[in-house]
């Protein structure tokens, strides 16, 4: 998400996209900062998505253990294609919504199966924030391009 948002801050055509991108970067960095010490305390090595946008082996096994596929995680896209996509804002929305949907699915899985109170609170915040962002992106896409994202809206937990 951070890589896509950094590209959107530079190439976004609508001010709403640039503003959302800045917010995503700030939120993601805060979430990573919050999760890292929790993971260390639990003895878990945090995995990151490399710049190419492919999930690491550890992230894949974590998602699969929760019953979530890579396409459900929004990680099956080729993020390197975003920089050359036209219209850029539509491509950004069409890539970010599935990514957000994947984060929401992971957050719902944490709420269903997790026991760490800090992670459960973070999961609730992720669901709330990303629901709002998915709704906004679909409204913008419908207004600017005549239809909402093919990915749909908020996944249900």
Which residue stretches match the model-derived regions?
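His/Met- and acidic-residue-enriched segments that coordinate or traffic transition-metal cofactors
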Residues: 1-157
């Amino acid at each position: 998400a951070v890589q896509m948002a950094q590209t959107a801050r530079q190439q976004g055509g609508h001010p709403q996209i640039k503003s959302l991108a800045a917010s995503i970067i700030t939120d993601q960095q805060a979430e990573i900062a919050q999760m890292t010490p929790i993971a260390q305390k639990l003895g878990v090595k945090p995995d990151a998505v490399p710049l190419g946008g492919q999930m690491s082996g550890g992230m894949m096994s974590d998602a699969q253990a929760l019953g979530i596929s890579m396409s459900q995680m929004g990680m099956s896209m080729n993020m390197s294609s975003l920089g050359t996509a036209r219209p850029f804002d539509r491509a950004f929305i069409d890539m970010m919504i599935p990514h957000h949907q994947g984060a929401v699915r992971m957050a719902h899985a944490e709420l269903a199966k997790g026991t760490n109170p800090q992670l459960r609170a973070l999961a609730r915040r992720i669901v709330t924030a990303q629901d709002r962002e998915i709704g906004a992106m679909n409204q913008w896409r419908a207004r600017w391009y005549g239809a909402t994202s093919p990915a749909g809206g908020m996944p249900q937990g």
